[in-house]
Amino acid sequence: MRSHQMAAFFAVSLMMMVVLGALSAPIPSPRPIEDIYPSQLPDAGTAQIVAGDSGILPTLLAVGFDPNDRSVLKPVKNSMTQRNTA
């Protein structure tokens, strides 16, 4: 009976700690608009390039893509699957 009381006490204590921790957390304040510099905003010229011809990036990616390239695939050497032929 005593162990049930201790378990209930610890469960309630844990719940109280979680609730108090969540309630006492600081509220994040958003940065004011004055902290955003013009250099962080997108360039109007870039937007015109993207809107005018958005096919250049997929084209560049497709030029460098080779579906038969196996240079990064290396055979796995596993002593359990290799047979000793000597």
From Swiss-Prot:
The answer to whether UniProt assigns keyword tRNA processing to this entry is no
Q: Where in the cell is it found?
A: Secreted; Secreted, Cell wall
* Regions crossing the membrane: none
Key words, A-Z: Cell wall, Secreted, Signal, Virulence
ATP-binding: present as a keyword of the record?
Answer: no
Q: Name the phenotypic consequences of knocking out this gene.
A: Leads to attenuated hyphal aggregation, fails to undergo massive late proliferation and produces only a few spores in plant tumors, resulting in reduced virulence.
Give the signal peptide range.
1-24
The primary location reported for this protein is: secreted
Q: How does it assemble?
A: Interacts at the cell wall with secreted rep1 repellent peptides.
Q: What does this protein do?
A: Core effector contributing to spore formation and tumor formation at the host plant. Modulates surface hydrophobicity promoting cell-cell or cell-surface contacts. Lep1 and rep1 interact in aerial hyphae to form a strong hydrophobic layer. Plays a crucial role in hyphal aggregation that might be a prerequisite for strong proliferation of diploid cells and for induction of the morphological changes associated with spore formation.
Give the protein family: Belongs to the lep1 family.
- The name this protein goes by in its record: Late effector protein 1
Give the organism the record lists: Mycosarcoma maydis (Corn smut fungus)
